[in-house]
Amino acid sequence: MKRPTLEAVAARAGVSRATVSRVVNGSDTVNPDIRTAVLRAVKELGYVPNPAARSLVTQRTGSIGLVVSEPPARVFSDDPFFSQVIRTVCLELETADRQAVLMMPSSPDGQARVERYVAGGHVDGVILLSLHGADPLPAALLRTGVPVVSHGRPVSTARPPYCDADNVGGARAAVQHLLDRGRRRIATISGPPDMSAGLDRLAGYREILSGTGRRSLAAIGDFTRESGAAAMAQLLEDDPGLDAVFAASDLMATGALYALRRAGRRVPDDVAVVGFDDIDAARFTDPPLTTVRQPIAEVARTIVRMVLDGADDTTPVIFPVELIVRDST
């Protein structure tokens, strides 16, 4: 069977082709009775608008690019952060009658392909996730004129509008909690130094300790469980007498719990542990993990609204966080 055309719908509804075009493209200038007749003809004939032709009329593709600057193996690992953000973004876009186009550039060639794709008019906006260091992509995408919003504060000098959680404040609350529990030799497992979440959570840790005159002790991780275990082992070697650790992610905190068990340290009797994120697994570690809850879904929903609104407001949106106290402290 041949695909029904605009002309066929117009003939069935008894109106012009231009009127049908306005109705199917969402124009509000058509008489309600005529609109009803056109929509009835569309349903009876099974007419489906041509996406390419429709985008020429509306100047919109109906798609939003979700650019994740991580290798696919990391995005689809056991880190629940990525799955929750991607799921929330897709659901929010579906509610707005949009779809997500997932892109994961992990090389300069991949970044160039993303830039060409966006500059070619294939998406109506871009959401950037998990930016690292002096990533050239934000500046390149901003030059295309397409609305661009970042999930998290960009570290690069190119600063698209962004939404984030209060990483500095959350780290402060975590370390202050450990001090209030009587802990005196508090170490940290920080995130990557080329990511704002890593930098800001380390800054919050150092701010609280500097106010007490205590020495800071840090080991660097990459937000994975394995890096948390390795960093914890290094911290115990550097300072066997430490009595608390603030890990900048829950996955690194679970790695720290594993390393502490292997070293024969009791949690929280010998070493108290605090994480950051409040992933579902934090309630089921042994012991259950004290952590800083960040509103991952709320941040993701806000970013979608920002990009759909055209990213006109450059004022950052920062969500508060909450300390969740469990048995690990």
Label the predicted regions.
Residues L45, R181-G182, L235-G241:
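Glycine-rich phosphate-binding loop signature in dinucleotide/nucleotide-binding domains
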Residues M1, S63-V67, P71-Q176, G241:
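Alpha-helical recognition/docking segments in bacterial nutrient-uptake
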Residues E44-N50, S107-Q111, L257:
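Short gly/ser/thr-rich secondary-structure transition/capping motifs
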Residues R184-I186, R214-R215, V267-A272:
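Short acidic capping loops at alpha-helix termini that bridge into adjacent secondary structure
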Residues M1-G62:
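N-terminal helix-turn-helix DNA-binding module of bacterial transcription factors
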Residues P71-S83, L102-Q111, C163-A173, I189-A233, ...:
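Hinge/beta->alpha junction and helix N-cap segments in small-molecule ligand-binding domains
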Residues D238-T329:
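Flexible loop/turn connectors
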